[in-house]
Amino acid sequence: MKLEGTELMLEYVISTNTAYTQHAISYKSNGLTVSGILNIPEGEGPFPLVIFNHGHIPASIYTRGRGLRREQDYLAREGFAVLHTDYRGHGESDESPDTRMVYDAGLEYAMDSINAVLAVREAKLPKIDSTRVGMLGHSLGGGVTLNVLTSHPEIVNAAVLYAPVNSDAWENFTRWRDEREEGDRTREALGTREENPSAWDALSSLTELSNLRAPILLFHGTEDSDVPEDWSDTLSQRLTELGKEVTYIEYEGEKHEFIPKWKDFMEKTASFLHQELTPVDPS
């Protein structure tokens, strides 16, 4: 996976309040311009960085920073610098140069997510501590997060998976992409899992879970009709078998986006990130 994150730009201020300032940003991801938002808390800092990976929203209706606005606000008020990447092809970002319409299981988006961290590090913003990095991914963004954690485990210190898609790319493909034009082109290029298991393994974080280093906080609702809860059941079990640090929280009755349990979800998320991203006092 080629990685080059550079030229972070704070383009303009979207809004400001007593807790944080929200900036429209752009950065270069492998030479492409990718847009997003960055919430920087008030105060001296430096504040830990949390990257947000959003779920699937059609590019035709997507707008800058869309998808996790409540969560962006909450964590910024908790003292985290929150960078929400739009991904290539979304918001004000450049389009992907790959026009084959072959399913890639979010690997390009994972590049954009990692490159966001690298761009912040290059920029050396005085109020952001980019050596302490958390990541939060919802749905598709949960899959993007798993791709980051398994391909470049040194990048992220702690991760929150919010109703994530499957770690097996074939399962995601057959559930959402197989009936589209992309499905036909993908089958032509890669075949099925039975025909070409190595190709599908290469797209799947499932086969690389042993690489994972960061502690994970995993959430899923029992009434999620978009992403089956048993996918997270299986992921939690597999991570536990591998000896990885995972905490799995199931919310009875919650759907794909939490409502009654949202406050509890965010309190647990903030507590986890504070614990994992706070520097250890050497004294």
Tell where the protein language model's regions lie, with residue ranges:
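Alpha/beta-hydrolase fold nucleophile elbow
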Residues: 126-138
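Short substrate-entry loop that stabilizes the transition state in hydrolases
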Residues: 45-47, 55-94, 168
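C-terminal catalytic histidine-bearing segment of alpha/beta-hydrolase fold enzymes
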Residues: 233-236, 240-283
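N-terminal cap/lid segment of alpha/beta-hydrolase-fold proteins
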Residues: 3-44
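Alpha/beta-hydrolase active-site loop
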Residues: 102-124
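Short glycine-enriched nucleophile-adjacent loop
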Residues: 118, 142-153
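Mobile cap/lid helix-loop segments that gate and shape the active-site cleft of serine hydrolases
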Residues: 59-62, 157, 164, 168-208, ...
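Short beta-strand/loop motif that positions the catalytic acidic residue
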Residues: 212, 218-220, 224
